[in-house]
Structures are given as structure tokens and as C-alpha cells.
Swiss-Prot record:
The lineage of its organism: Eukaryota, Fungi, Dikarya, Ascomycota, Saccharomycotina. The keyword Transport does not apply. This is MICOS complex subunit MIC12. InterPro entries: Mic12 (IPR031463). One of its GO terms (cellular component) is MICOS complex. Keywords: Membrane, Mitochondrion, Mitochondrion inner membrane, Transmembrane, Transmembrane helix. GO terms for biological process: cristae formation. It holds the Pfam family AIM5.
Length: 97
């Protein structure tokens, strides 16, 4: 009985692999394979290696830049302290409402 189960499981796995291979690579002239991201990247890399395709350098846009302001740590701590004081005062005053 165990040989029958083993044979059935091997047949099921083999059939599943064969069907997935057929539908991915063969059916509709390999539509899914030709349009896959891995294939496109592989073709682009192969073109760069062969010299038939150029690398287009990207130019950074100025609109996405973030301005960073460096502040002393004491100012940041003062801001955090003041925020906590304001929140505590609002909490106390909310009792009277």
C-alpha cells in the first residue's frame, strides 16, 4: 500500500510541475514568461553586457528634496517639555468642562 501512495504522490507532483511548465512557457507562446519582470531585467542586463543597450543615467529631481534643519538637543528637549506641560494643563482643565 505504501508503494501505491508513493507512486501516486510522485505522479501528482510530476503532473503539477509539467502543467505549470506548459502554462508558463509553452501556452500562448510563453505569454507569462515573455512579460515577466525577471525576463525583462535579464534581457536588459544581457543587452548591457553585449553592448547593444546603453545605461541611461537618472537625473535627480529637485522637487523631492527634503530640507533638514539641525537644532541643538537642548531646544528639542525644551519643545518636548513644553508640549508635555501643555498636555497636562489641558488634561486638568478638561475636568472642569
Amino acid at each position: 500500500m505504501s508503494k501505491l501512495i508513493k507512486l501516486t504522490s510522485i505522479t501528482a507532483v510530476s503532473s503539477t510541475l509539467a502543467a505549470s511548465y506548459y502554462f508558463y512557457f509553452v501556452d500562448r507562446d510563453g505569454f507569462h514568461y515573455q512579460n515577466s519582470q525577471w525576463k525583462k531585467i535579464g534581457d536588459k542586463v544581457q543587452g548591457i553586457i553585449d553592448g547593444s543597450e546603453n545605461i541611461n543615467p537618472s537625473t535627480p529631481s529637485n522637487s523631492n528634496q527634503v530640507i533638514v534643519v539641525k537644532r541643538p538637543m537642548t531646544e528639542t528637549m525644551k519643545d518636548l517639555w513644553n508640549e508635555q506641560i501643555r498636555n497636562t494643563a489641558n488634561w486638568f482643565y478638561s475636568w472642569g468642562k
